[in-house]
Amino acid sequence: MTATPKPLVLIILDGFGHSESPDYNAIYAAKKPVWDRLLATQPHGLISGSGMDVGLPDGQMGNSEVGHMNLGAGRVVYQDFTRVTKAIRDGEFFENPVIAGAVDKAVAADKAVHILGLLSPGGVHSHEDHLVAMAQMAARRGAGKIYLHAFLDGRDTPPKSAQPSLERLDATFAGLGKGRIASIIGRYFAMDRDNRWDRVQAAYELIVDGKAEFTADSSVAALEAAYARGESDEFVKATAVVPAGAEAVRVEDGDAVIFMNFRADRARELSRAFVEPAFNEFPRERAPQLAGFVMLTQYAASIPAPCAFPPEPLTNVLGEYLAKHGKTQLRIAETEKYAHVTFFFSGGREEPYEGEERILIPSPKVATYDLQPEMSAPEVTDRIVEAIEQQRYDVIVVNYANGDMVGHTGVFEAAVKAVECLDTCMGRIVEALDKVGGEALITADHGNVEQMEDESTGQAHTAHTCEPVPFVYVGKRKLSIREGGVLADVAPTMLTLMGLEQPAEMTGRSIVTLG
């Protein structure tokens, strides 16, 4: 048997979907000679990265966590979103022993239940249906004091779209006859993932101490005031909701705190501030002794708190299977997507496999990435080219964050520059592979940058899309690409190209047929 080409590089262009419409399509508008040449000369097709094809509800846009899980697992991974929704529908959620344990302990001592989470129908980090269910559960179990600390979205939803969600939760509490929204703050603060602890501190002090930049007598009034200050949902400053005659809510000893985000990466920092005894990223005036702090899912194994829906282990994901066959692999990304190309691609595993190396390139320290649309892509590419030339690795998995992170800003010109930068980077990788006889597969985890304006509202479109994503083979072999592929088919495709048998646990099907 002839040796398979080495290395095989999987290039994941984050947020790089395919749209037939040229309108507000940053990919269409960009000058991209390398991409155009690849599409003209190399086998390519489209694969699905949304909805049931990735284990999400029908019509639900994909996201980076889900995308990388499916890409690495080689099977459709039943997502936490669908697990929690199903548990609510089945009634199991309301008896969840971990949540019930914390709530019951607080109720027995006549203490409060605090619900934290992204209040949004976005379905990427959380879903407001889950927050409604949590409020109902607390009330059913006898909690007299139920407080929602609402983080506002505007990133996986239109920039100013929080009002219906706030009104829905106000109505939920009114219907229960108890509980209320206690505070609102933008996800920019509460859900940082880049160690910008000053942002997290603003959220922590709002929730725990009732310390706010602004106060309002209702959640909707708080939102209207934020809009009047020029803030969109994502950036709403710390606001305590204090109805007439009431005081700002604080978290007290003996209270229960339930964090209702199901996606881990943007829930970790705030969780650590609540539960780590030796936490020192910012000074905490108080660290209440809680009846319980519950993570909806496991945000990190190192966070000392129980989770309501523990991970369901995945065996024989691509990284593990390559290691079993003595293959070497490199994972590389900049900070913003490093967790995706390591933890999520490995099916929720923190530690590297035997023969796996990792390179983390710091993301630029700018307020928003439209200010530096190239991000750290050139530096990432430097290291990939070096790795290809060394021929030390059988497989290289790289994530380029630009399409997604710049797409989220809603700034069209910056998104075009991001695509043009990616094109240059791909050109360098293709050239390096050509020299050593390596191969690449280029795909994406979900769409974003191909739709930069919401036609129905005229607002910037900052969220992901349900568009299919490209799948391009780069190399010298003659092969054909089938239609109807999904992200879960990418790992089996890589095994086909490497001449490795597919493990039974991988239920995806190779997208390529050799010969």
UniProtKB/Swiss-Prot annotation:
Binds 2 manganese ions per subunit. GO terms for cellular component: cytosol. The keyword RNA-binding does not apply. Its EC number is 5.4.2.12. Pfam families: iPGM_N, Metalloenzyme. GO terms for biological process: carbohydrate metabolic process; glucose catabolic process; glycolytic process. The active site is at residue 64. The keyword Thylakoid does not apply. CDD domains: iPGM. Mn(2+) 1 binds at residues 404, 408, 464. It catalyses: (2R)-2-phosphoglycerate = (2R)-3-phosphoglycerate. It is an enzyme of class 5 (isomerase). Its cofactor is Mn(2+). Substrate binds at residues 125, 155-156, 187, 193, 263-266, 337. Mn(2+) 2 binds at residues 14, 64, 445-446. Keywords: Glycolysis, Isomerase, Manganese, Metal-binding. It comes from the Bacteria. InterPro entries: Alkaline_phosphatase_core_sf, BPG-indep_PGM_N, Metalloenzyme, PGAM_B_sf, Pgm_bpd_ind. Coiled coil: none annotated. Signal peptide: none annotated. Belongs to the BPG-independent phosphoglycerate mutase family. Catalyzes the interconversion of 2-phosphoglycerate and 3-phosphoglycerate. Monomer. This is 2,3-bisphosphoglycerate-independent phosphoglycerate mutase.
